[in-house]
Amino acid sequence: MANHKIAIIQFYPEPNEIESNHIRAVTFIREAAASGAQLAVLPEYHLADFVPSHDPAIRQQCANWKKYLDAYCALAKECNICVVPGSFAELHDDSTIVNATYFIDNNGVICGRYEKKNLWHPERPYVKGSKNDTRHTAFDTPLGKVGMVICWDLAFPEAFRELIIQGAKMIIVPAYWKYTDASEIGMKRNPKSEGVFLDAAVVSRAFENTCAVVFCNVAGPEKEGFAGLSQVALPFVGCIERFENSEEGMKIVDVDMNILEEAEGAYKIREDIATSDWHYGYNR
C-alpha cells in the first residue's frame, strides 16, 4: 500500500460569513495542493458555523450549499487534489436541513456522500438525521477504499465496523467538537475532558479497526470552548500528527498505509469479522 500526503485544515468558521469562509477555505486547499498533498480535509460546518442560536436567518443561507459544493469540485479538478469539504448544512426543497459531507476526487468527481446519523443534541431540533435503514457506506477513491463519519459519530464504534466490513482503509471525520460539549458538570470534573475523549477515541478507532483515522476539527478561541486537536492516527503507532491547540492552521501529514496491513496481520480483526459465524451480528 502507498503513502498518502493528507492536509488537515483546522479552520475557524466565522459565524454566518459563508462567502468569506469559502474564500479562506479555497486558499488553504490551494496551499495544500502546492505542498504536494493528495487530499485536503476541512471540518464540519466549515462555511456557516451552523449554530442556530447565532442567527435564525442562517437557515435560508443553507439553501446555497450546492453552489459551494460545485465550486469545490471545480477546485479539486483544477488543483489535482482530492477534497473533503468538511460538511454542509443543506437546506432542501422539503424544508429539511441535513448535515452532509462529500469526498471529491482529483478530477472533480464526487466519489461518496454521507449524511450524519448521530446528531449532537443541539442539532436535533434543526437538522434531520439520515434514515435508520441506510447503512454507512465505503467507496472507492484514488486513495483506496474510504469511509466517512461526522463528529459525534466518532463516539459509536458500530459506524466504523460497518465501514471496515466493506473494506474501508481510511475513515475521515470532519468535526465541530468543543470542550464545552462536556456540559457544565463535565467541565467541573475536567475542563479538558473532551480532549481526553478525542485523543482516546481517534486512536482507539484506528487500532480496533486496523484503519487510518483522519480527524479534522474546527479552530477557534479556546476561551469560547474550542478544542481543535485535529489529528491523524494509525494502528501500532497511534497519533502520528496532531494540533496541540485550537488555533487555525494546516498540517500536511505523511500517512504510511502499509502499517494497516502489518496491523491486520497481527490482530486479524478484519479476518475475524469476515467469518460466517461472526458472533456480534454486524451487517454484511
Label each PLM-derived region with a short phrase.
Residues L91-T96, P221-G225:
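Short loop/turn motifs at secondary-structure junctions and domain boundaries
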Residues Q10-N16:
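Short polar catalytic/cofactor-binding loops
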Residues A48, Y102, Y114-W120, Q231, ...:
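Short beta->alpha transition motifs characteristic of CBS
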Residues N64-V84, A155-M250:
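CN hydrolase (nitrilase-like) catalytic-core segments centered on the catalytic cysteine
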Residues N21, I29-I58, A76, V83-V84, ...:
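Active-site beta-strand/loop signature of hydrolases that rely on acidic residues for catalysis
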Residues A2-I8:
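Extreme N-terminal starter segment of soluble prokaryotic enzymes
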Residues P85-S87, A100-F103, T137, S230-V232, ...:
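Short beta-strand scaffold segments in enzyme catalytic cores
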Residues H92-A201, E262-I273:
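Active-site catalytic loop in hydrolytic enzyme cores
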